[in-house]
Amino acid sequence: MCRINFTTLSLILVLWSGSLMSEPSQNADGSIKGLYEYLLQREYAAPVSYADHQIKRKAVRSPSLRLRFGRRSDPSVPVEPEDDDMVDQRSIRAPQLRLRFGRTDPLWSSFNENALLEEKRAPSQRLRWGRSGGGMFSTNDVMQQKAIRAPQLRLRFGRSDPSWAMFNEHQLDEQQFADATRQPSKTLRGDEPTSIESTEQVESEENSPSNMDEK
């Protein structure tokens, strides 16, 4: 009996000691895990699901709904505005309707758009290389012809293009005016006669002695 009691007591002691050694490790693991989960719940509002001891962090770390560049993560806010809002924004963002610091002119209305289109530069009636389109204006419209610059008649090295002579209506008058301005003024010369008759008399007097010598 004593031997049986001794063996049973020894077995009980071994089992009890083993249980005592295993319980602290389990309690320690459980306490650390509970503390870790508690800290995670305090840091993040939503529950965190992790596996293999790897934490999956949230995309938005702050409780605010504002993200970078003014974007919002609120699902109630529509991502794209409606078509009416887009039209209004486009009309406001037009460069002719915007004032300084983003203000809009209340006196500006939509009827001024046609006036702006009319004030835009009309297509030029001048073609390339100084040519002008013949069908762009009527031949009787003299004012419009004067408004359009005449094509260049002078070529390189002072040469003129004869094909452009039809456009220069006053070519002869300009040439006569240039010749008249280039002639030296005879009124400023005191030793020479100023009239044509006096020049003829001088020439006849100079020729008369030569004729007498020949006779």
Swiss-Prot record:
Keywords: Amidation, Cleavage on pair of basic residues, Neuropeptide, Secreted, Signal. Residues 173-215 are annotated as: Disordered. The keyword Metal-binding does not apply. It is found in: Secreted. One of its GO terms (molecular function) is neuropeptide hormone activity. The modification Phenylalanine amide is found at residues 69, 101, 157. The modification Tryptophan amide is found at residue 129. Residues 23-56, 160-215 form a propeptide. GO terms for biological process: neuropeptide signaling pathway; regulation of multicellular organism growth; regulation of response to food. Residues 1-22 form the signal peptide. Its main location: secreted. GO terms for cellular component: extracellular region. It comes from the Eukaryota. Belongs to the NPY family. Plays a role in controlling food intake and regulating body size. This is Short neuropeptide F. It comes from Aedes aegypti (Yellowfever mosquito).
